[in-house]
């Protein structure tokens, strides 16, 4: 599997680090920076599918101009950038047309409304559009993994997301990565499909633990919220750096989706967010109408809309207490890779 990954993603260095396709925030600058530093950067879905495709086109231009990717710039190569889709809201025809034109190296599929049927449909249409584009599918339960591995459209990579993750994860049936991953790995044994670990990983310690569980690579989301290239409000980013104790200060709730006017997510999913006054007051009995009015007012005050006294959505994972500052994506990757190698080396001396 390691040899296969190396041939598919020849610019990637070890350990294999991925920046997740965070909605809107994972723009072309972050994706190109991550891939340019030896990882694999994904562009996140936009407000509509066309937005993601515009980002992918911008990333393609940046890659062609970059000396880092000069050896990959032939007409036969795929774009060293991935793109993510939320299947319940994205348009597969628009996505397939753009993938055919721009040939990203990977397409990350997540959150189908109709389960495996939607995943199969998207996988087939993307493969027809661009046979070289690898299909990455995110799952968060053993049941999803079982359905996926019985499919006629097997993915090229499975991303196993633990319940510690930020953004939208399983609403009620999620499980921590350290228990979920080995069970999925046992199920997938013999399939030769690489498994990537996601959820709660923000430094070399988490990455090393995931590799010891058998992961071929690791995915970080919350850590990259504090990358300088991330498309994010300064107030939001400052709150990610400030917050600690993810067990106490984050929760899964649909409140912030609804305050922002986002409805329609499949019922299996619910986002994790840093708690602030909106959630606290909801729990105390404040009506949604009043919370909505206060939320909309907070949108007008800039960076002060975030923080413990703020009211705006701050989607982030339980690992938020491990994020201590804003750095360039390249520095984050180097730091995590070096720490992982050091920790793995130390562990090998103790067994």
Tell where the protein language model's regions lie, with residue ranges.
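Active-site entrance/lid segments in N-terminal catalytic domains of soluble metabolic enzymes
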Residues: 2-191
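Conserved active-site-proximal phosphate/metal-binding subdomains
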Residues: 165, 170-196, 202-351
């Amino acid at each position: 599997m390691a040899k296969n990954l190396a041939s598919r993603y020849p610019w990637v260095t070890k350990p294999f680090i991925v920046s997740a396709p965070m909605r809107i925030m994972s723009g072309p600058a972050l994706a190109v920076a991550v891939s340019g530093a030896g990882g694999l950067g994904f562009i996140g879905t936009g407000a509509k599918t066309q937005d993601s495709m515009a980002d992918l086109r911008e990333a393609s231009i940046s890659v062609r101009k970059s000396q880092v990717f000069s050896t990959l710039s032939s007409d036969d190569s795929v774009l060293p950038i991935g793109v993510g889709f939320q299947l319940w809201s994205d348009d597969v025809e628009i996505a397939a047309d753009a993938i055919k034109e721009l040939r990203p190296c990977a397409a990350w599929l997540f959150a189908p409304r109709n389960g495996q049927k939607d995943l199969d449909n998207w996988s087939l249409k993307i493969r027809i559009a661009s046979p070289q584009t690898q299909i990455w599918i995110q799952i968060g339960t053993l049941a999803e993994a079982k359905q996926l591995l019985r499919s006629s459209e097997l993915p090229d990579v499975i991303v196993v997301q633990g319940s510690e993750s930020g953004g939208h994860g399983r609403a009620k049936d999620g499980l921590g990565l350290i228990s979920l991953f080995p069970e999925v790995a046992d199920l997938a044994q013999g399939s030769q499909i690489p498994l990537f670990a996601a959820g709660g990983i923000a430094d070399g310690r988490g990455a090393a633990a995931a590799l010891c569980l058998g992961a071929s690579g690791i995915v970080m989301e919350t850590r990259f919220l504090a990358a300088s290239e991330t498309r994010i409000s300064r107030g939001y980013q400052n709150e990610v750096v400030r917050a600690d104790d993810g067990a106490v200060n984050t929760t899964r709730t649909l409140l912030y989706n609804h305050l922002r006017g986002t409805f329609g997510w499949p019922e299996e999913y619910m986002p994790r967010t840093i708690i602030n006054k909106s959630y606290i007051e909801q729990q105390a009995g404040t009506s949604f109408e009043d919370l909505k009015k206060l939320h909309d007012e907070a949108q007008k005050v800039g960076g002060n809309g975030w923080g413990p006294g703020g009211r705006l959505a701050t989607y982030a994972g339980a690992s938020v207490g491990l994020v201590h500052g804003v750095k360039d994506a390249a520095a984050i990757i180097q730091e995590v890779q070096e720490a992982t190698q050091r920790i793995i080396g130390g562990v090998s001396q103790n067994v």
